[in-house]
């Protein structure tokens, strides 16, 4: 359940297993050819074979798109083997793309319906989905033209080493921000579970419970320390396939919560009509189509747009999925079909979440899991279970946001070498740093605005620039120019959201 792909990590490189390589293809860059050189036997190095979210593996072909025979790699136990490729199906790739896009933040977007109006918020979901599909097709084009399946390698192929470093910096910042956001979500999820399960009569809602008890430092400090130790220990794992089960737990918990909200929203809306709605009082009327409130001094429109950009961000996960189609007839066409279906399914799930969240509380729609007020302060056992399931699933799925962070760091600064000492130190320092930030700064919607701004560079600017480079045509060619202008407009909208959110944080 994640807005980032999970790289498959595992094993060490054994030069004795490497067979002689044929001459390099003319499209192979010097950097790539150097990766096939033998290394000393005592060098510990990771061979990364990306497989987003671990739902199915994508391995190296017996012969890749450049006509080269890849060297054998080792598994997590150090045993030599040649990675097996599993060809992607349209259905499997669609599920992968949908799973990359979705996360527990899906339950927060109904909050924006109050300002956007329900209908207009749904319209903007469609617009953002179309923008992302447009960007994804550019990713597929640049991957096909370069013959490479790795985002960083494609960037270096067309933009040089400086371009690759710039991309990895954005990926590192994005991964840290996303990791911090989801670590921060675990705390209120557990707090809401405890309040609704054990303190429902003593504290009227979660805000009251947090002010009086859960938010106290004597609870918050040991909670985040323990959480960092647990997540950090899980993140030490090098082979992400050992966490395959977490994807199913996360999807199952999210699906259970969505189905529950769908079932309950009718009774909540009926409760609103009977107890809150007054025909002669506009303040009690639901905002169905009034878009004007989105353009206030708070710049809610731009913040909401950035939130949606983050919700659909999946471009860096497209490349390894695309690799499974390359050996198939009409592979690019199949990839574009699965991408379109992935955007469609993601949009449908967002529609369900937004509509149900809006109907649950049309006046002040809240987060559906944490801040939703239980009807008549009743004990909602199914929702109590949902909160616990989502909180526990996050503990096991958060490491999925850490793996691409570690991958970007070692590719940028350690030349792919990952020693045990570096793994332990970097992992615990990173997780504890994110936990400290999450404990101090807990504004989830603001996190989404910041991450949305960072994501546009990874999801729009880099893919469009790479596509322009790969066409071999001048920058001023009308299609290239149109793509670039559209990407800049998206980045500008996200920049306004970033500045507005930063201003809110500074001014209080």
Q: Where would I find each of the regions flagged by the language model?
A:
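Juxtamembrane transmembrane-helix boundary signature
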Residues: 98, 126-159, 174
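Alpha-helical transmembrane segments and their membrane-interface exit regions
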Residues: 127, 131-135, 254, 456-463
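Loop-to-helix transition at the N-terminal end of transmembrane alpha-helices
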Residues: 115-130, 251, 452-453
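The first (N-terminal) embedded transmembrane alpha-helix
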Residues: 88-106, 226-228, 309-317, 492-493
């Amino acid at each position: 359940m994640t807005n980032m792909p999970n790289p498959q990590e595992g094993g060490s490189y054994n030069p004795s297993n490497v067979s002689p390589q044929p001459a390099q293809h003319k499209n192979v860059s010097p950097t790539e050819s150097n990766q096939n050189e033998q290394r000393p036997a005592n060098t510990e190095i990771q061979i990364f074979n990306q497989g987003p979210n671990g739902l199915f593996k994508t391995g190296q072909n017996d012969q890749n798109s450049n006509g080269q025979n890849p060297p054998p790699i080792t598994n997590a136990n150090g045993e030599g083997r040649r990675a097996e490729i599993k060809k992607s199906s349209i259905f499997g790739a669609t599920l992968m793309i949908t799973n990359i896009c979705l996360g527990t933040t899906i339950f927060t977007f109904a909050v924006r319906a109050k300002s956007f109006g329900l209908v207009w918020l749904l319209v903007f979901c469609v617009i953002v989905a179309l923008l992302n599909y447009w960007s994804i097709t550019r990713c597929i084009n640049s991957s096909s033209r370069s013959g490479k399946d790795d985002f960083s390698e494609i960037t270096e192929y067309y933009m040089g080493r400086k371009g690759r470093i710039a991309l990895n910096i954005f990926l590192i910042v994005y991964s840290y921000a996303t990791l911090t956001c989801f670590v921060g979500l675990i705390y209120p999820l557990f707090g809401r579970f405890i309040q609704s399960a054990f303190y429902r009569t003593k504290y009227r809602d979660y805000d009251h419970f947090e002010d009086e008890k859960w938010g106290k430092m004597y609870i918050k400090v040991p909670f985040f320390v323990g959480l960092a130790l647990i997540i950090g220990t899980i993140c030490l794992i090098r082979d992400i396939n050992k966490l395959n089960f977490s994807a199913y737990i996360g999807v199952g918990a999210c699906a259970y919560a969505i189905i529950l909200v769908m079932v309950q929203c009718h009774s909540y809306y009926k409760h609103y009509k009977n107890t809150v709605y007054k025909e002669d009082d506009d303040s009690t009327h639901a905002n169905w189509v009034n878009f004007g409130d989105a353009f206030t001094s708070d710049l809610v429109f731009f913040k909401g747009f950035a939130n949606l950009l983050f919700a659909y961000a999946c471009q860096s996960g497209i490349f390894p999925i695309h690799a499974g189609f390359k050996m198939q007839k009409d592979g690019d066409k199949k990839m574009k079909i699965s991408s379109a279906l992935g955007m469609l399914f993601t949009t449908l799930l967002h529609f369900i979440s937004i509509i149900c969240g809006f109907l649950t509380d049309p006046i002040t729609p809240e987060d559906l899991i944490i801040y939703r007020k239980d009807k008549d302060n009743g004990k909602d056992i199914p929702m109590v279970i949902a909160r616990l399931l989502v909180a526990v699933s996050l503990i096991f799925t958060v490491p999925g946001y850490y793996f691409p962070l570690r991958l970007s760091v070692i590719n940028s600064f350690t030349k792919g070498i990952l020693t045990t000492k570096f793994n332990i130190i970097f992992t615990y320092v990173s997780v504890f740093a994110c936990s400290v930030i999450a404990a101090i700064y807990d504004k989830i919607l603001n996190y989404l605005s910041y991450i949305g701004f960072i994501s546009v560079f990874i999801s729009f600017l880099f893919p469009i620039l790479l596509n322009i480079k790969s066409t071999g045509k001048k920058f001023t060619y009308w299609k290239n120019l149109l793509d670039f202008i559209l990407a800049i407009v998206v980045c500008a909208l996200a920049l306004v959201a970033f500045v507005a959110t930063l201003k809110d944080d500074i001014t209080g």
